[in-house]
């Protein structure tokens, strides 16, 4: 063991021999590059000054997208905006559900009494030629209220009011002309006239709206000529109440 230690102590100076040779050679013949080529691997000089910053390199490739961040806090309430324009009318919505029954209403005022129903219509089923007399109609189709007298051919007003009357008469073919008058309490309201040569028939009509008092009478009076009457009822007389008056 002691012998080995002695050998190491004799070899130790040999380890520093290359370094010393490099130093001597460098001192005797320096190169333009600094250290001799044979000592570039075993000799190191002092640190040099820091160099200048080089130009920026090209942009690198895009990085991987980061994770989605958390939602931020609600911002402060903004100022009220200006009033907008009126929008278009929307579509009709669905029908709502049926509501509940409301409370019973109060008792109402007495209603208007129903109007009296008055109407008649008569016709000639046979010829008539009694001049200057009231026309007696052989058939009565309608007589609501029975205010038309079938025996006299006269209508008696049961209430004061406004009445409508109409009549249509066919001239008999044996005469050329015929006159019929609408009478009101013995006074002529208007006339009906029809003319046609013998052998031919002709039909004429007229209408009236009269204000009658209760008890007034209205009828038709025959003038000259003759009227045609048969089952087809060409000659008729009708009237009805429009409304009552006070």
Curated annotation (Swiss-Prot):
Pfam families, sorted: C1q (PF00386), Collagen (PF01391)
SUPFAM superfamilies: TNF-like
Main subcellular location: secreted
Domain Collagen-like: from-to ranges: 51-113
Cellular compartments annotated: Secreted
Residue span(s) of domain C1q: 113-246
GO annotation terms (biological process): ERK1 and ERK2 cascade; glucose homeostasis; negative regulation of gluconeogenesis; phosphatidylinositol 3-kinase/protein kinase B signal transduction; positive regulation of adiponectin secretion; positive regulation of cytokine production; positive regulation of ERK1 and ERK2 cascade; positive regulation of phosphatidylinositol 3-kinase/protein kinase B signal transduction
Signal sequence coordinates: 1-22
Chain spans, region Disordered: 53-112
Biased composition (Pro residues): 55-64
Protein name (record): Complement C1q tumor necrosis factor-related protein 3
Species annotation: Mus musculus (Mouse)
Gene: C1qtnf3
